[in-house]
């Protein structure tokens, strides 16, 4: 059943807020958390409706909702037009959320890949071009959040999938939704994430896809950790070249 069917469209949220304020910590932050707020197919209609309803719920002068959480379960696309349209509405989502005056949180963030025809791409079928495109999309989304939402309204980004989803998973099975592989190796997506945050990826190669001759001197693991000395065995990057010990 739906609570609003019994308590009404206004009271079911107001009651939840009252109880949370009464029994929760004094500094509790209350968010309305929902998915498809970046909806490109209806010009962010769901988010616009949600912001309207927050105003209705708060119209009693007592109810206060601190923030809006957006569940960004996205897919990158190999079609340029499709990807640009998705970007347009993600940026519009962040602008609308910021304009609401509420705290803004990316509460569930992961990303699959669609081919140019709109079909989901399995993890094993990802190409180098797809990996790099996805990394760039991660970078763009994270940096757009940081640029569009004022710092005082930023309430963070929560990554939903740490690793790629295995075959048979109940969530986006057999798709490249993680920033690490199933074996916990950093992906191109990890580098894009870090770049979006304004950081530098600490690897033996300066950026994704760059030639190793431009790599800094040193010894690195394949995961990008710098070592003081050569290990007794394994595969490492030495001055930009892979070495088997």
Regions inferred by a protein language model and the residue ranges of each:
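Intrinsically disordered, low-complexity coil segments
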Residues: 25-26, 44, 58-64, 78-86, ...
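C-terminal outer-membrane/trafficking sorting elements
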Residues: 202-245
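Aromatic- and acid-rich polysaccharide-binding/catalytic face
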Residues: 23-36, 50-84, 91-119
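Active-site cleft segment of glycoside hydrolase catalytic domains centered on the general acid/base Glu
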Residues: 1-51, 78-92, 129-130, 168-183
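Conserved residues at the C-terminal ends of beta-strands
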Residues: 71, 160, 239
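Aromatic-rich peripheral "rim/lid" segments of glycoside hydrolase catalytic domains that contact
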Residues: 1-6, 85-103, 110-209
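Short amphipathic alpha-helical segments with coiled-coil-like heptad repeat character
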Residues: 76-78, 165, 229-235
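An active-site-proximal structural segment forming one wall of the substrate-binding cleft
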Residues: 8-23, 49-61, 133-152
């Amino acid at each position: 059943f739906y609570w609003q069917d019994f308590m009404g469209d206004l009271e079911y949220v107001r009651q939840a807020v009252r109880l949370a304020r009464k029994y929760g910590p004094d500094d509790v932050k209350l968010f309305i958390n929902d998915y498809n707020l970046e909806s490109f197919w209806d010009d962010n209609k769901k988010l616009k409706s949600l912001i309207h309803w927050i105003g209705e719920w708060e119209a009693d002068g007592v109810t206060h909702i601190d923030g809006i959480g957006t569940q960004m379960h996205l897919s990158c696309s190999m079609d340029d037009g499709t990807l640009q349209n998705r970007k347009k509405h993600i940026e519009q989502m962040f602008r609308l959320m910021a304009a609401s005056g509420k705290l803004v949180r990316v509460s569930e963030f992961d990303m699959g890949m669609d081919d140019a025809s709109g079909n989901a791409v399995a993890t094993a079928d990802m190409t180098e071009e797809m990996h790099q495109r996805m990394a760039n999309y991660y970078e763009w989304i994270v940096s757009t959040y940081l640029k569009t939402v004022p710092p005082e309204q930023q309430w963070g980004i929560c990554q939903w999938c740490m690793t790629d989803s295995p075959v048979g998973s109940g969530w986006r099975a057999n798709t490249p939704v993680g920033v690490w592989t199933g074996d916990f190796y950093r992906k191109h997506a990890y580098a894009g994430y870090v770049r979006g945050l304004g950081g530098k990826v600490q690897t033996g190669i300066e950026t994704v896809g760059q030639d190793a001759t431009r790599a800094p001197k040193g010894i690195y693991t394949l995961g990008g950790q710098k070592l003081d000395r050569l290990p007794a065995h394994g595969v490492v990057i030495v001055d930009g070249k892979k070495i088997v010990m």
